[in-house]
């Protein structure tokens, strides 16, 4: 670990982690300025998405980050919920059932809105045991 990565992790957990219990979802949004402030390198945000899944009852965790050239999404899930399907259908991405990535050419705010607008489509799957 670098000191910058540890500081970014602390900042994210304290200030940026959002929880939507009605969707059993946690998400993090990071701006380009926030990534720059912590001297974030590619890969520094990779493990952050997993913190959301460590919260009791959470089945979907997403990090949305502004990488200047586009907006990147990293999606992780527990159980049978397929983040691969969500990433492929809505975020030009894909991967595996429980780990996927995506991207958009929308703004950061538009991407967050799209993610929040898409969640209700998956509510039944997310709240199923």
Label every PLM stretch briefly.
Residues 1-90, 95-129:
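Hydrophobic helix-and-loop "lid/oligomerization" segment in the mid-to-C-terminal part
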């Amino acid at each position: 670990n670098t000191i910058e990565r540890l500081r970014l992790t602390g900042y994210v957990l304290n200030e940026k982690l959002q929880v939507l219990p009605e969707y059993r979802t946690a998400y993090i949004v990071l701006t380009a300025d926030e990534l720059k402030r912590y001297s974030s390198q590619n890969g520094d945000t990779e493990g952050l998405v997993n913190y959301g899944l460590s919260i009791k009852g959470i089945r979907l965790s997403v990090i949305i980050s502004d990488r200047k050239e586009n907006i990147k999404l990293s999606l992780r899930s527990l159980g049978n919920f397929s983040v691969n399907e969500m990433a492929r259908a809505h975020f030009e991405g894909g991967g595996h059932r429980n780990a996927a990535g995506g991207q958009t050419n929308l703004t950061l705010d538009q991407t967050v809105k799209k993610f929040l607008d898409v969640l209700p489509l998956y509510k039944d799957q997310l709240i199923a045991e």
